[in-house]
C-alpha cells in the first residue's frame, strides 16, 4: 500500500463521530451546556442542597459538572489520538497554500515544521469567569469561537511574520498531550515577554517575540483583545452569550469587531462579505488611506457560505480544493454538524484540520517565557470531504494592494472555472459597492409592472430567514 503513517512523522488520526454526552441531574444553578443538546441560557441561584456561591463564582455542583464534561470530552479526544492515520506517498499534501510530497525524510520534516507552527487554540478550563455568568470553561460550546480564533491567528502570522516562518522550537509530530502546563490561580492578563535566548536584535529574536505576542492576544483573560472573554462580549450585541452555540457567519462578524477595537493593530482590517459576494470597491474603501500615495492596509476577507442543504454538495469539492491550494487562503472555519473544526489543507478526498475540542488548562501568558506547547498541535488529522458541514466561512489575507489584485485574479479564475459552469459558484466577486448593487436591484424591480392581487383571506406571514441562512444549490 502506497501510504505512510509517517512515524517517520507519527501522524495521528482525527476524532470519531460525536456521540451524545450523557446528561446527569440538572441542578437549579448555572450549568455547562450539553454540546449536542439545546443551548441553555443558565439560571440564577444556587442548586438545592449546595451552599450559595459568591456572585460570579461557580458553586461546587457547577465545578464538578465542568470537570466531568472536561474529562468526558478528553476521553473522546484522547481515544482518537491513539489511532493512526496514513498519508499517501503518491498524492501531494496541501497545507496552508504549500505543497508537500512524502518522498523522503526531508519532505516529511518540512511538513512537520510547517504544521506544528500553526496556532492551535482549544477549549480551556479554570479561566476567570465569563461576563454575565460563572462559566470558567468553554468545553462543550466554544468550538466555533476557537476555530475563528485559529483562522484570525493564521492571518496575524502572515501579517506580522515572513510567509516562510516556522516555530524554531517546534517539536516533532506525535500525540498532542502537552506537558508541563500549570493551571494558575491568579490572572494578570497579557504582558510583554522577556526573551530567554538569542542575541539582542537578531531576526530570530524579533520573530519569536512577535510569535509570543500573537499568542498572548488570544489568552483566556478579559484583557486579551482576541481572547474568549472579548469574543463572547462582542457576541452579546447579536443576542449571544456564554454557553450559546455560535455559527460561522456570526463568528466572522465578531472577529471583524474584535480587530476594529484592537488598539495594538492599526494596519489590519477585516472585511466580511454580504450575500456571498465580495464587493471590490468596499474592500478598497476599507483598506485605503486618506493619503492616496500611502500604502494600503492589510485585509482579512471572510466569506460565509453554504455549500449544500443538509450535507455538502460534492460539486463544490473541486473549488474548495482550489482555494485551499492558494497561499492567500487562511483556511475554512467549519467542521462537521455541531462539531466545529478549522480546515487548513487536504490530500485527495480528505481535509486536514486542527481540532479545538481538547480541553487544556489555562496558561498564564503574563509569566515570562510562558509555555507554548499547548498552543501548537503535533497531530495532523484527516476527515473526508463528505462529512463536512455545508455551513462554513472561508478566509483570505492580502497584505497590500498588489496581493489583493492577485487574490481577485485567483478567485476569478477559480470561481469561473469549467468545473463551475453548471452550478452556482461558492461565492462571487463584484465591482463597485454593495450599496450600489442594492440600489440597482431596487430600481429594476420598480421599473417592472406591478401585479396587484385581491385580498381573499388571511395573509400568511413569510418566515424570516436567519442570519445563518444562505442561497445554495
From Swiss-Prot:
GO cellular component, one term: mitochondrial matrix
Keyword rRNA-binding: no
GO MF annotation, one: protein-phosphatidylethanolamide deconjugating activity
Annotated positions for site Cleavage: 62-63
Modification(s) after translation: Cleaved by CASP3 during apoptosis which leads to increased activity. The cleavage by CASP3 reveals a cryptic mitochondrial targeting sequence immediately downstream of their canonical caspase cleavage sites which leads to mitochondrial import of the protein.
InterPro entries: Papain-like_cys_pep_sf, Peptidase_C54, Peptidase_C54_cat
Active-site residues, as the UniProt record annotates them: 143 (nucleophile), 355, 357
Catalytic activity as recorded in UniProt: [protein]-C-terminal L-amino acid-glycyl-phosphatidylethanolamide + H2O = [protein]-C-terminal L-amino acid-glycine + a 1,2-diacyl-sn-glycero-3-phosphoethanolamine; [protein]-C-terminal L-amino acid-glycyl-phosphatidylserine + H2O = [protein]-C-terminal L-amino acid-glycine + a 1,2-diacyl-sn-glycero-3-phospho-L-serine
SUPFAM superfamilies, sorted: Cysteine proteinases
Activity regulation field: Inhibited by N-ethylmaleimide.
Entry EC no(s): 3.4.22.-
Modified residues (Phosphoserine): 466
Effect of residue 430 to T: Found in dogs with neurodegenerative disease
UniProt-annotated stretches for the region Cryptic mitochondrial signal peptide: 63-102
Segments for region (Disordered): 1-59
Residues annotated as transmembrane: none
Assigned keywords, A-Z: Apoptosis, Autophagy, Cytoplasm, Hydrolase, Mitochondrion, Phosphoprotein, Protease, Protein transport, Thiol protease, Transport, Ubl conjugation pathway
Biased composition (Basic and acidic residues): 15-26
Cross-referenced PANTHER family: CYSTEINE PROTEASE ATG4 (PTHR22624), CYSTEINE PROTEASE ATG4D (PTHR22624:SF36)
Family the entry assigns: Belongs to the peptidase C54 family.
Disease: Defects in ATG4D are the cause of a neurodegenerative disease present in the Lagotto Romagnolo dog breed. Affected dogs suffer from progressive cerebellar ataxia, sometimes accompanied by episodic nystagmus and behavioral changes. Defects are caused by impaired autophagy: neuronal cells display cytoplasmic vacuolization in the nervous system, as well as spheroid formation and cytoplasmic aggregation of vacuoles in secretory epithelial tissues and mesenchymal cells.
Domain notes: The cryptic mitochondrial transit peptide is revealed after cleavage by caspase upon oxidative stress and cell death. It acts then as a functional transit peptide, and allows the import of the cleaved protein into the mitochondria.
Name this protein carries in UniProt: Cysteine protease ATG4D
Provenance organism: Canis lupus familiaris (Dog)
